[in-house]
């Protein structure tokens, strides 16, 4: 029975000797991959259920993100200088927020000056609208504040479903076995950080989906041996219009392709440059151009300068220079993508196993460190370092703020991390990292009611 179970987990969409066998294997693989994805999504749903039902607004600037969604639901894209709507201020006053207790649910006019950042809708300063679109399907602004917030939060789970579908597509393109696909899905969707944002009103809930579609585009280009410049550019622009820092996903793939060529001592000629780098370069440039164009539009539409709105966010520490410790804190944060916010030893072990395996691929030679995957593992660490440097530099430029990059900003890398580990590890190692540890971590979290 054990041998048959192992054989089942090794089923791939390309199995079979002839046409009929291959079609049967593909249907079988697709059926089981969907069932595995459903199981992982249920795990994500159960794990995030308490967060989804918490009464107050989350620490993740949920009040400002919620206001952005309400504006979109009324057909208005918020501008820099817009104040929080009366609906949002009433909800925050009624439910409370992080470090802001409830002040009652009376239906009276609220004063924006009584709220954070002078009552400005500060997410309008730099957030594009695409990451909020699923929330428009679930938002019910006319309901009572608690019911309205609970309904809106389900938009984050829609992003998780979209991400799962994209990851199945990536598994199909890469001919992953069912166990390998399970590992990719688990690492991407059962991360406590991913679960948290999927249970919250925030555009960070689109991060895993963004990384998954970037990975799919890369795999399609590689499978067809075509640069797919237009498609790559379009995917990049859409990624940038979800969130600017999501550029880390195509940037990491670009670095991985370059490092693989360096390791293989391959020098692309003019004739092969586009075919080798075209797709990932187009996605990277597209994300930068898309987000850059959005910032230009934000400045053109602003009723109050973005710098004024940012300076209204009181209480943030400032610095005369970008501090190395801030960058190091960011690196530490980005390497904690599978760690829960509450004491949860199994998540710590899972996190150590995942990032330790990546580090092992970098330093070891042989099958686990074969050039292409080893190059991609190095690229992941380069992407993490790039985020840790770019975020405080951007915040310093905006107002000498001293911010380390939050853990959730590395979420677009999870599909790439899962893919690299799935293609590198074999047998028991993959079973432990991709199935046993995440399942035990979620079970322990639910059993102990630690969220």
Go through each PLM region and give its residues.
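Membrane-lumen/periplasm interface segments of multi-pass, membrane-embedded glycan/lipid transferases
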Residues: 273, 277, 292-367
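Transmembrane-helix signature of polytopic, membrane-embedded enzymes
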Residues: 146-147, 168-190
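Interfacial juxtamembrane loops and adjacent helix segments
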Residues: 73-152
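Start-transfer (signal-anchor) and selected internal transmembrane alpha helices
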Residues: 1-48, 57-60, 275-284, 429-434
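Perimembrane helix-loop-helix junctions
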Residues: 220-221, 230, 249-285
């Amino acid at each position: 029975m054990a041998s048959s179970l192992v054989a089942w987990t090794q089923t791939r969409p390309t199995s079979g000797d002839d046409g009929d066998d291959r079609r049967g294997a593909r249907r079988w693989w697709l059926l089981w991959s969907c069932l595995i994805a459903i199981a992982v999504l249920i795990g994500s749903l159960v794990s995030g259920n308490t967060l989804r039902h918490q009464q107050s607004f989350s620490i993740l600037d949920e009040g400002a993100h919620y206001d952005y969604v309400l504006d979109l639901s009324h057909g208005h894209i918020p501008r820099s200088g817009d104040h929080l709507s009366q609906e949002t201020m009433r909800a925050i006053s009624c439910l409370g927020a992080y470090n802001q207790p409830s002040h009652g649910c009376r239906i009276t006019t609220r004063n924006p000056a009584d709220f954070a950042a002078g009552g400005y809708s500060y997410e309008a300063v730099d957030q594009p609208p695409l990451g909020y679109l699923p929330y428009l399907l679930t938002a019910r602004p006319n309901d009572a504040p608690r019911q309205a917030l609970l309904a809106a939060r389900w938009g984050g789970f829609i992003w998780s479903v979209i991400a799962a579908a994209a990851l199945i597509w990536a598994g199909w393109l890469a001919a992953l076995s069912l166990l390998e696909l399970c590992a990719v899905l688990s690492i991407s969707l059962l991360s406590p950080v991913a679960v948290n944002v999927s249970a919250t009103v925030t555009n960070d809930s689109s991060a895993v989906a963004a990384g998954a579609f970037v990975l799919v585009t890369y795999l399609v280009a590689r499978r067809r041996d075509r640069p797919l410049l237009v498609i790559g550019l379009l995917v990049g622009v859409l990624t940038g219009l979800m969130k600017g820092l999501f550029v880390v996903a195509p940037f990491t793939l670009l670095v991985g392709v370059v490092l693989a060529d360096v390791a293989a001592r391959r020098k692309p000629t003019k004739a092969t440059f586009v075919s080798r780098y075209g797709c990932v370069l187009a996605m990277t440039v597209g994300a930068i151009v898309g987000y850059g164009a959005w910032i230009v539009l934000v400045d053109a539409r602003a009723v109050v300068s973005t710098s004024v709105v940012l300076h209204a966010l009181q209480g943030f520490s400032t610095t005369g220079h970008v501090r190395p410790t801030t960058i190091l804190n960011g690196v530490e944060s980005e390497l904690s993508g599978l760690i829960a916010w509450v004491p949860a030893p199994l998540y710590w072990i899972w996190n150590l196993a995942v990032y330790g395996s990546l580090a092992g691929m970098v330093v070891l030679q042989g099958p686990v460190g074969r050039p292409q995957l080893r190059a991609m593992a190095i690229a992941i660490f380069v992407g993490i370092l790039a985020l840790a440097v770019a975020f405080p530099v951007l915040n310093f430029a905006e107002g000498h703020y001293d911010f380390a990059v939050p853990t959730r900003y590395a979420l677009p890398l999870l599909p790439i991390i899962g893919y690299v580990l799935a293609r590198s590890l074999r047998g028991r190692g993959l079973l432990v990292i991709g199935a046993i540890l995440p399942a035990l971590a979620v079970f322990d979290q639910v059993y102990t009611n630690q969220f």
